[in-house]
C-alpha cells in the first residue's frame, strides 16, 4: 500500500485505515501504522470495538497522537436499536481514549 501511495503522491489521494487482522504484528499495529501514517485520510473503518484480537486502544492512542479529527465508520451487525448501540460505542470510545485502566462514567 505504501508503494501505491508513493506512486500516486497527490494530496487528494489518502488511505482509509481498515482495522484488519493482517496489519497486527505481535499484538501491535505500530509497524503497519508507521508505514502509512503520513497518508492517512479522514476516515477510519472499525469493526466491533469489544474484539480484543485487534489493538483498538493502541489505534486510538495513535489517532490521538496525530490529533485525528476525522470519522470512524463502524462495520457492525444490524440492530433493532441503533441509538442504544451508539451509546455503547460512545462509552467504548471514552474508555479507549482514556489512560489505560481509567474509566469515565
Predicted regions located by residue number:
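Histidine-acidic metal/acid-base catalytic patches
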Residues: 1-105
Amino acid at each position: 500500500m505504501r508503494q501505491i501511495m508513493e506512486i500516486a503522491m497527490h494530496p487528494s489521494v489518502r488511505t482509509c485505515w481498515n482495522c484488519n487482522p493482517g496489519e497486527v504484528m505481535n499484538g501491535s499495529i505500530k509497524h503497519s501504522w508507521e508505514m502509512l501514517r503520513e497518508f492517512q485520510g479522514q476516515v477510519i473503518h472499525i469493526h466491533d470495538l469489544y474484539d480484543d484480537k485487534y489493538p483498538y486502544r493502541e489505534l486510538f492512542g495513535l489517532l490521538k497522537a496525530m490529533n485525528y479529527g476525522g470519522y470512524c465508520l463502524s462495520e457492525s451487525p444490524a440492530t433493532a436499536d441503533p441509538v442504544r448501540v451508539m451509546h455503547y460505542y460512545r462509552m467504548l470510545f471514552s474508555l479507549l481514549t482514556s489512560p489505560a485502566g481509567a474509566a469515565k462514567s
